[in-house]
Design a protein with these regions (language model features):
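Ferredoxin-type iron-sulfur electron-transfer modules and their immediate structural context
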Residues: 1-54
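Iron-sulfur-cluster electron-transfer modules
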Residues: 31-208
Length: 211
């Protein structure tokens, strides 16, 4: 606590700051998970509210690792995956997954996936030989603010003399949002498809904007 400069900076977990109850903290979720391993899970609306109100930001892990060596975020993520496997999903996340399956993106599609790179003169890894891929991801492909990050990354790589390319419209979603939402099977399928694409294109090095 000696590192906290004031009360206004004491809260790091969004959900425990909002609900002010230990179950909504990282430690509280670990306790719930440990109890579930011993006695099984009795799903209730409040339990699912606790599970899905975690932003998986990792602040709990940073706080705990200041004083002890333990993994906090992974068990919380695994418990969410178990909820999904048991059919206890969240409607908003169900809609996101449905959109991913339908459009290939975890965020709304606003145009061509590779449009963010227009005018930058970047290589297309499907046509131009290179072993390094700059992977933009869903947000940097379709959201204006994130597109600026991808564009800046491309310019920096160019100035550094890095020989790289992009997948453009052929780029696939990483499935990271599906993983964070607890949909492990969807994530693994996206990973499988990406691995196949990288192998076919001869990619050996990935530079990722997201995730």
């Amino acid at each position: 606590m000696q590192q906290v400069s004031g009360l206004e900076y004491a809260n790091v977990c969004p959900s425990v700051a909002r609900y002010d109850f230990h179950s909504y903290s990282g430690g509280g979720r670990l306790n719930i998970g440990a109890a579930a391993l011993k006695k099984g899970v009795n799903y209730t609306p409040r339990l699912l509210d606790i599970v899905y109100n975690c932003q998986l930001c990792g602040a709990c892990g940073v706080s705990c690792n200041y004083a002890m060596d333990m993994e906090v975020l992974q068990p919380i993520s695994e418990f969410r995956m178990q909820c999904v496997k048991d059919g206890k999903t969240h409607p908003a996340l169900d809609r996101m997954i449905a959109g991913l399956k339908q459009t290939g993106s975890s965020v709304p599609v606003t145009g061509a996936r590779g449009a963010w790179a227009a005018g930058l003169g970047l290589k297309d890894v499907a046509k131009d030989k290179t072993t390094t891929l700059l992977y933009a991801g869903d947000q940097a492909s379709y959201e204006a603010a994130a597109q600026k990050i991808a564009q800046a990354a491309a310019r920096l790589l160019g100035k550094a003399g890095v020989d790289f390319g992009i997948a453009g419209d052929a780029e696939l979603s990483s499935g990271a949002a599906a993983y964070e939402a607890g949909y492990e099977a969807v994530f693994l399928e996206q990973a499988k498809q990406n691995a196949a694409y990288f192998k076919k294109a001869g990619i050996t090095t990935l530079i990722t904007v997201s995730p």
